[in-house]
C-alpha cells in the first residue's frame, strides 16, 4: 500500500494550504506512528516530505501560530484560526442501514444546507471565503477563511455550533449567534415562525405549540456537524489534495455550485490508481461498494480487481493483499 501512496505523491505536486509556514503540520505513517508539530515553509518542503514519508494520513492545523513547531500549545503562540466544520456520514440517523452511496448523498445534502442556509444566508459569509472539501472517506469539511472568524475563541465558536445544530434552540441563543456575527434578523426565528404556521393568531398560541415548532425546526433544518472540530481552536484537519489512508481517495476541493452533482467515488480516484489490477482476499462476505462505476466483489475468497478498488477494499479494512 505504501508504494502506491508514494507513487501518487511522487507524480503530483501538492499545493499547501495558505500560510502553510504558520500552520502545524502532522501525519501518520502506515506503521501507526503519529508525527506532529512540524513546520513546513513552502510547497517544495511539503512535497519533499510527502514523497519521502508516503504517509497514510496528512494533516495541517486550522490555527495560525507564530511558532508552529513548538510541542506545547501555549508556546506555539496562537494567532487565530480558520472556522472549520466537519460533516461525517457516520453521524446520520440510521446510517448503519444505508449503503455507502446513500450515506454520501445524505451528508452531501447536509453540507449544502450548511453552506446555503447558514453560512451564506444567515451569517452572510461570502462564497469567496468558503471552501468545501470531500474528506476522502465519509463526509465533507467546510473551511471559512474570513477576517470576522480568525480571532474567535472556543466559546464563540461553540455558540456558532449550537446555532447550526439547534442544540440550544431558544430566542437567547439565536439572538446571540446573530449579533455575534453582525448578521440580519431571520434564521431560526423565521424557521420556527414558519413551522408555527398561520393556523391561529399569535396571541392564542400555547407554549406547547412553540415547543413543537422548535422541535420540528430542529429536526428539519439543523445540520449534523461534529461540533468539537469547530470549537477546538487547535484542531488539525486533513490537508487538501492528500490521500485518505482508509480509502485511498483524494481529499478534494468541491466548488460550491458543483456540490449537488459531485460524486466522490468517481471524481476523487487518483489517476495513478486507475490503471492495472491487484489480487485481494476477502475474509468474509461484505456489503458491496461501487467505485468508479464498478461494483466490488462481496463473497469471501480471492478476487482480481482494479487498482483503485483494491486500494479501497484494503484501506477500509474489508480485504487484505494475499
UniProtKB/Swiss-Prot annotation:
Any GO molecular function: DNA-directed RNA polymerase activity
EC number: 2.7.7.-
GO biological process: DNA replication, synthesis of primer
Descriptive protein name: DNA primase small subunit PriS
Residues annotated as the enzyme's active site: 86, 88, 226
Family: Belongs to the eukaryotic-type primase small subunit family.
Cellular component terms per the entry's GO annotation: DNA-directed RNA polymerase complex; primosome complex
Role of this protein: Catalytic subunit of DNA primase, an RNA polymerase that catalyzes the synthesis of short RNA molecules used as primers for DNA polymerase during DNA replication. The small subunit contains the primase catalytic core and has DNA synthesis activity on its own. Binding to the large subunit stabilizes and modulates the activity, increasing the rate of DNA synthesis while decreasing the length of the DNA fragments, and conferring RNA synthesis capability. The DNA polymerase activity may enable DNA primase to also catalyze primer extension after primer synthesis. May also play a role in DNA repair.
Keywords: DNA replication, DNA-directed RNA polymerase, Magnesium, Manganese, Metal-binding, Nucleotidyltransferase, Primosome, Transcription, Transferase
Cofactor dependency: Mg(2+); Mn(2+)
Family annotation (NCBIfam families): PRK00419.1-3
Amino acid at each position: 500500500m505504501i508504494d502506491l501512496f508514494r507513487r501518487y505523491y511522487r507524480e503530483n505536486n501538492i499545493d499547501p494550504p495558505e500560510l502553510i509556514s504558520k500552520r502545524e503540520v502532522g501525519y501518520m505513517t502506515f506503521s501507526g506512528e503519529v508525527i506532529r508539530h512540524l513546520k513546513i515553509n513552502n510547497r517544495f518542503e511539503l512535497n519533499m516530505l510527502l514523497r519521502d514519508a508516503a504517509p497514510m494520513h496528512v494533516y495541517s492545523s486550522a490555527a495560525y501560530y507564530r511558532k508552529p513547531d513548538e510541542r506545547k500549545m501555549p508556546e506555539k503562540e496562537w494567532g487565530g484560526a480558520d472556522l472549520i466544520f466537519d460533516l461525517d456520514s457516520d453521524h446520520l440517523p440510521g446510517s448503519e442501514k444505508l449503503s455507502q452511496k446513500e450515506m454520501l448523498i445524505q451528508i452531501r445534502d447536509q453540507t449544502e444546507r450548511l453552506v446555503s442556509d447558514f453560512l451564506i444566508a444567515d451569517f452572510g459569509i461570502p462564497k469567496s471565503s468558503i471552501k468545501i472539501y470531500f474528506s476522502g472517506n465519509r463526509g465533507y469539511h467546510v473551511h471559512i477563511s474570513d477576517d470576522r472568524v480568525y480571532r474567535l475563541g472556543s466559546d464563540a465558536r461553540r455558540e456558532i455550533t449550537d446555532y447550526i445544530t439547534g442544540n440550544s434552540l431558544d430566542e437567547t441563543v439565536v439572538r446571540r449567534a446573530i449579533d455575534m456575527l453582525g448578521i440580519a434578523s431571520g434564521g431560526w426565528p423565521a424557521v420556527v415562525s414558519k413551522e408555527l404556521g398561520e393556523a391561529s393568531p399569535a396571541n392564542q398560541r400555547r407554549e406547547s405549540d412553540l415547543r413543537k415548532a422548535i422541535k420540528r425546526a430542529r429536526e428539519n433544518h439543523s445540520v449534523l456537524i461534529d461540533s468539537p472540530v469547530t470549537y477546538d481552536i487547535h484542531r488539525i484537519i486533513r490537508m487538501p489534495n492528500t490521500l485518505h489512508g482508509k480509502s485511498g481517495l483524494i481529499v478534494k476541493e468541491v466548488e460550491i455550485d458543483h456540490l449537488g452533482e459531485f460524486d466522490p467515488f468517481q471524481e476523487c480516484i487518483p489517476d495513478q490508481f486507475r490503471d492495472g489490477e491487484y489480487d485481494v482476499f476477502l475474509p468474509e462476505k461484505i456489503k458491496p461498494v461501487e467505485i468508479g462505476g464498478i461494483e466490488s466483489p462481496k463473497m469471501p475468497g480471492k478476487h482480481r480487481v482494479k487498482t483503485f478498488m483494491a486500494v479501497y477494499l484494503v484501506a477500509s479494512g474489508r480485504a487484505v493483499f494475499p
